[in-house]
Amino acid sequence: MVWSRDQRRKVALENPHMQNSEISKRLGYQWKMLTESEKWPFFEEAQRLQAA
């Protein structure tokens, strides 16, 4: 997932001792909190990458 890849790096750098499972939980919560319009650019990028 385009969004989670970038966000995972950011969260991991900000929280170097956080376990991967906790990072995943945090990312899942953050993704759910985004509106559809906030998510849309990431859906478009994923589609573009799949077509390439």
UniProtKB/Swiss-Prot annotation:
GO function term, MF aspect, one: calmodulin binding
Alphabetical list of InterPro entries matching this protein: HMG_box_dom, HMG_box_dom_sf, SRY-related_HMG-box_TF-like
Pfam families: HMG_box
Presence of keyword Nucleus: yes
A GO-annotated cellular component: nucleus
Gene3D superfamilies according to UniProt: High mobility group box domain
GO biological process: cell differentiation; sex differentiation
Subcellular location(s) of the protein: Nucleus speckle; Cytoplasm; Nucleus
Keyword list, A-Z: Activator, Calmodulin-binding, Cytoplasm, Differentiation, DNA-binding, Nucleus, Sexual differentiation, Transcription, Transcription regulation
Residue spans binding DNA: 1-52
Family according to the record: Belongs to the SRY family.
Function: Transcriptional regulator that controls a genetic switch in male development. It is necessary and sufficient for initiating male sex determination by directing the development of supporting cell precursors (pre-Sertoli cells) as Sertoli rather than granulosa cells. Involved in different aspects of gene regulation including promoter activation or repression. Binds to the DNA consensus sequence 5'-[AT]AACAA[AT]-3'. SRY HMG box recognizes DNA by partial intercalation in the minor groove and promotes DNA bending. Also involved in pre-mRNA splicing.
Summary of subunit composition and partner proteins: Interacts with CALM, EP300, HDAC3, KPNB1, ZNF208 isoform KRAB-O, PARP1, SLC9A3R2 and WT1. The interaction with EP300 modulates its DNA-binding activity. The interaction with KPNB1 is sensitive to dissociation by Ran in the GTP-bound form. Interaction with PARP1 impaired its DNA-binding activity.
Protein name: Sex-determining region Y protein
Organism placement in taxonomy: Eukaryota, Metazoa, Chordata, Craniata, Vertebrata
